[in-house]
């Protein structure tokens, strides 16, 4: 069952779901709560490797990722981040989210931004039960023009679903969870896959 606006507000008030800083109640819609863009970004360095062998030996994959990903880019609140057509970038939400082990979250981009070509989450829009941290966004500009994105702008909407039971393996208790408590635009850790 997906939570409605009054349940989202109640779950926030009771601390069942935590979002920090907490968005005002005006950011809670019928079945979602708006999240804003943070100021942490990462991009791919152009032509720094001919390819990434995602199924290769861990050490080689790790070295390739180090070569192709930029260091963290922090921008000021009044500074735009330009996402050019055909470019993938990582960013974070401003808010940090904590979910209990019986609730799953779903992050969707805004229709108004999608109509300009912005994909907010290329594939991974599921926020696992037991998640805690900022949500990393996988931005892609499929439009024809560069997009100027600024910290604090509304970037997506988070909805919540109650699971049939408490998860036996919530994200915060998994040993193989690669992105626990992330607070910045963490690059891919595919090299840590089992």
Curated annotation (Swiss-Prot):
DCTP binds at residues 110-115, 128, 136-138, 171, 178, 182. It holds the Pfam family DCD. The keyword Cytoplasm does not apply. It is an enzyme of class 3 (hydrolase). InterPro entries: dCTP_deaminase, dUTPase-like_sf, dUTPase_trimeric. Keywords: Hydrolase, Nucleotide metabolism, Nucleotide-binding. GO terms for molecular function: dCTP deaminase activity; nucleotide binding. The active site is at residue 138. Its EC number is 3.5.4.13. It catalyses: dCTP + H2O + H(+) = dUTP + NH4(+). One of its GO terms (biological process) is nucleobase-containing small molecule interconversion. Pathway: Pyrimidine metabolism; dUMP biosynthesis; dUMP from dCTP (dUTP route): step 1/2. Catalyzes the deamination of dCTP to dUTP. Homotrimer. Belongs to the dCTP deaminase family. This is dCTP deaminase. It comes from Mannheimia succiniciproducens (strain KCTC 0769BP / MBEL55E).
């Amino acid at each position: 069952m997906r939570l409605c606006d009054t349940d989202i507000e109640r779950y926030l008030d009771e601390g069942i779901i935590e979002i920090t800083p907490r968005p005002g109640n005006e950011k809670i819609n019928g079945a979602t709560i708006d999240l804003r863009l943070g100021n942490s970004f990462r991009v791919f360095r152009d032509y720094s490797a001919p390819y990434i062998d995602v199924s290769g030996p861990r050490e080689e994959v790790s070295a390739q990722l180090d070569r192709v990903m930029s260091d963290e880019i922090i921008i000021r609140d009044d500074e735009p981040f330009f996402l050019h057509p055909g470019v993938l970038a990582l960013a974070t939400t401003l808010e940090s989210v904590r979910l209990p082990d019986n609730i799953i979250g779903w992050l969707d981009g805004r229709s108004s931004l999608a109509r300009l070509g912005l994909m907010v989450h290329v594939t991974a829009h599921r926020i696992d039960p037991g998640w805690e941290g900022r949500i990393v966004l996988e931005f892609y500009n499929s439009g024809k023009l560069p997009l100027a994105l600024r910290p604090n702008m509304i970037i997506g909407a988070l909805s919540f679903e109650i699971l049939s039971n408490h998860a036996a393996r919530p994200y915060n208790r998994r040993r193989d969870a690669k992105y626990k408590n992330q607070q910045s635009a963490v690059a891919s850790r595919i090299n840590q896959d089992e």
